[in-house]
Amino acid sequence: QGSKRGKMQMEVVSNLLQAAVTLLGFFLGGIRYLKSRKQEYFLLTCFYGCFFLGSLYWTLYLLLFSETPQVFYVSEFGWIASVIFLYLLQYTLSSAEERDFSTRKSLIAPLIGIPLCVFYCTFGDVLSNLLWCGMMIVVSYHSIRGLAYAQIQTGTACKMRYFHIGVLCYVAVEYALWLSGCLWPGYSISNPYCWFDLLLTGCLFALLPATGKAVQT
């Protein structure tokens, strides 16, 4: 019982940290939007806000009932909405030339995402996994293409690579988080899931300065 309580406390602390970081991102993004009135910062603020709401529900449920939410779709609505805003941010930041740019490297996204999706579906809800992996494939496809395009640019245009790297890190850690959750269920300091969850928090916050650099292009 004590071990279970300790694991629950660790998960609560990790989720509180994630909620705090995304709330901070929401306020900082909002301040930047109010100062500049740039659509990119509005979309970034929405990304953080939706992610925060999903994390907040999950954390409050843990605190009140000492177990993970049984109806996880409530949190997923917020998290899914955040990825949609992330994609819209991707599209807004990209130029017409970047969107028309073609590279075979982009195929890495479905080549990795589809097998992982099949694997995840054997452990959890099929519809949820199809939706999540589909979105991850889309945003990673565009970021791989954008990164390849940024590598051949000069001047301020090459700063877009920081944003694309940030998105790819976010996607990679999400994949690793889900994979560790399938292979090593539970939440403890020795579980890779715990460390990937903390790493995800760092990736989320890193998107703020990465977007700032991209907006300057």
Residue ranges and their predicted role:
Residues L64-Q70, F119-L130, W184-Y187:
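Membrane-interface helix caps and helix-loop-helix hairpins in membrane proteins
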Residues L17-G29, Y41-L64, S75-F85, R161-L183, ...:
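Hydrophobic alpha-helical transmembrane segments of multi-pass membrane proteins
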Residues S36-G49, E98-A109, T154-V167, Q216-T217:
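Membrane-interfacial loop-to-transmembrane alpha-helix junctions, especially the N-terminal start
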Residues G25-S36, T59-I108, I144-A150, L208-V215:
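Internal transmembrane alpha-helix with an interfacial aromatic "cap," most often the third helix
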Residues K4-L24, G124-C133:
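Hydrophobic transmembrane alpha-helical segments in integral membrane proteins
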Residues Q1-K4, T217:
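Cytosolic, intrinsically disordered low-complexity tails and loops
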Residues Y141-T217:
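C-terminal transmembrane-bundle signature of multipass membrane proteins
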Residues S106-R145:
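Hydrophobic, aromatic-enriched interface-forming segments
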